[in-house]
């Protein structure tokens, strides 16, 4: 906390990533959030060496700065099955989300301040896919309980890209939403990603430094 005098530092120990959420809404900034679990934390304002926190003061490295992704011009692909969802000029996406949950749990113990350990649970990948209802293609997939795929590529103007691939998903819900006169009919679908025996993963994520 550099606005403090002396500067205060807080150190979080044994951190593990529990949740990652990504939301794509139309004509907006792509929004992501992270949730972490840890053993405990410590705080000190004993500048400059902070002996309560470190055996040796670490080197501070500034985070790299990049332009944020927007959902208008930075979406390289949003696909279901072989083709992009809107390949036929129909069923454009209103909103898409990915929610990854590692189902971690803090393990308390007598005589331990904080957590004695972090328990690892089963990976869960869910999300939503809301599209315009221009034909019955997605509705048939939902009604027939068919397996399909979902993939997303964000691509910035500088070539930086992120790839999210779910080779096996099933929709757990979704029905045409008819809001009223002079309004668009949509399908707000919810899905669950499943482990693919072919590829050996439920979801794959990749960062690409440059792509065109």
Question: Where are the predicted features?
Answer:
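Signature of extracytoplasmic/envelope-associated structural regions
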Residues: 1-212
């Amino acid at each position: 906390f550099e606005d403090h005098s002396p500067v205060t530092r807080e150190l979080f120990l044994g951190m593990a990533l529990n949740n990652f959420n990504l939301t794509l809404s139309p004509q907006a900034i792509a929004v992501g959030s992270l949730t972490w679990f840890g053993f405990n934390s410590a705080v000190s304002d004993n500048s400059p060496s902070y002996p309560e926190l470190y055996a040796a003061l670490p080197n501070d490295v500034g985070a790299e700065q990049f332009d944020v992704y927007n959902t208008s011009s930075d979406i390289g692909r949003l696909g279901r099955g072989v083709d992009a969802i809107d390949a036929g000029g129909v069923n454009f996406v209103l909103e898409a989300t990915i929610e990854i949950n590692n189902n971690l749990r803090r393990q308390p113990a007598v005589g331990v301040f904080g957590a004695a350990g972090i328990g690892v649970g089963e990976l869960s990948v869910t999300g939503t896919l809301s599209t315009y209802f221009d034909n019955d293609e997605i509705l048939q997939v939902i009604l027939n309980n068919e397996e399909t795929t979902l993939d997303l590529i964000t691509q910035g103007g500088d070539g930086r890209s992120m790839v999210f691939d779910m080779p096996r998903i099933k929709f757990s819900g979704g029905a045409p939403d008819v809001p009223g006169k002079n309004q668009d009919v949509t399908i707000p679908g919810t899905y669950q990603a499943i482990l693919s025996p072919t590829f050996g993963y439920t979801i794959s994520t990749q960062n690409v430094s440059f792509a065109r």
